[in-house]
Design a protein with these regions (language model features):
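Short linker/helix segments within small regulatory modules
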Residues: 15-23
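SAM cofactor-binding core of SAM-dependent methyltransferases
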Residues: 98-167
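Short metal-binding segments enriched for Cys and/or His
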Residues: 29-47
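SAM-dependent nucleic-acid methyltransferase catalytic core
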Residues: 55-91, 140-255, 259-265, 279-282, ...
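Short, cysteine/histidine-rich loop/knuckle motifs that typically chelate Zn2+
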Residues: 6, 28
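Residues immediately within or flanking Cys/His clusters that coordinate Zn2+
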Residues: 1-4, 23
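Cys/His-rich microdomains that often coordinate metals
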Residues: 11-12, 33
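Long, positively charged, glycine-interspersed low-complexity recognition regions
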Residues: 261, 271-326
């Protein structure tokens, strides 16, 4: 007797079902059930919900099992995962680390750390934001274009204003988009491209350049470029990317870090609407239910709507101290 793990429909050996060597598809709900339940543990959907911690709350103890470099990315991001790298590493399954897929690459701090440490063999980055994509593409293919500008005069408030205009225009060259995004990210409050300059619109040059470190940026850019043969890059809508490319790597993990549910519109150029969050949830859970392939780890700010959107996910909570800084 066979029983669908999703809708509990039962079948006997005489029923004709779509199946493969590992399991079968239910003709009622289209869900896939493994013959051996232990196989399901290799194909998780784990939702990590970030809760805002108070200053007096006890810090989570993260086991130090692997030395990971956390500052390889040239980008600064609100909600970036550099501070959670050690914690996230403990959530990864060793048998699913041949390929690591970042569906919303952003600063890609987790993937870069894993690739640098030799934990993964291949890193796949996707980001729909033209500026983010342009920067990664330029770092991988023609980093000298960035380095030449880094070696030039220190950027000014006017340079930042022009960079933001380039990002808004949608018609710049790949090189100009990449440089403009790097400038806007490094010189704006908390790395938010939409935010005011560091130190304010009429602030000092010293305040504006407080997070501008050409030497360190050059080192990071060159190091990432040195790993280019192990990095694949895409510029696609998240759902299209998952269904066409990202999800179908065997022995892999898809790391899905969408724009924040509550603050996303204030923080990102490519933010999500309510409908976008819902569409992503439907896409992810449909893949998980019908075609179990890659491990999927999803991170979100904790909100009742997000919990309701992911009934199929194993939900865990992580306490995080959020801050918007210079």
């Amino acid at each position: 007797m066979l029983t669908c793990r999703w809708c509990a429909e039962t079948y006997d050996e005489t029923d004709s079902l779509d199946c493969n060597d590992t399991g079968f598809w239910c003709d009622i709900c289209d869900g896939f059930t493994f013959y051996h339940p232990s196989e399901q543990t290799k194909h998780r959907l784990l939702l990590l919900l970030e809760q805002k911690g108070s200053g007096s709350a006890p810090q989570q103890v993260i086991p130090s099992v692997q030395k990971l470099r956390k500052r390889l990315s040239p980008l600064r991001y609100p909600g970036g995962k550099s501070k959670l790298i050690d914690y996230l590493y403990t959530k990864l399954s060793a048998e699913n680390l041949e390929t690591f897929v970042e569906v919303f690459a952003g600063g890609a701090s987790l993937g870069l750390s894993l690739l640098d440490a030799g934990i993964i063999q291949c890193l796949v980055l996707n980001d729909k934001d033209p500026g983010v994509y342009a920067l990664w593409k330029t770092i991988l293919e023609s980093p000298q274009e960035l380095l030449t500008r880094l070696h030039g005069a220190a950027p000014t408030h006017q340079d930042l204003a022009e960079a933001k205009a380039v990002l808004s225009s949608g018609s710049a060259s790949m090189s100009d988009l990449a440089w403009s995004f790097l400038l806007a990210n490094r010189l704006s409050y908390s790395g938010i491209v939409k935010a005011n300059p560091l130190g304010g619109k009429n602030g000092s040059e010293e305040a504006l350049l407080s997070r501008w470190n050409p030497k360190r940026l050059e080192t990071n850019i060159l190091h990432i470029h040195s790993m280019k043969n192990k990095i694949a890059l895409y510029n696609m809508d998240a759902c299209d990317f998952l269904t066409e490319f990202g999800y179908w790597h065997r022995n892999s993990t898809c790391f899905i870090d969408p724009p924040y549910y509550l603050q996303g519109p204030k923080l990102y150029n490519c933010f999500f609407t309510e409908a976008d969050h819902r569409e992503l949830a439907e896409c992810i859970q449909s893949l998980y239910r019908e075609f179990p392939e890659a491990d999927m780890i999803l991170t979100y700010d904790d909100h009742p709507c997000i919990r309701e959107l992911y009934p199929l996910a194993q939900q865990e909570f992580v306490q995080r101290h959020y801050s918007l800084r210079t």
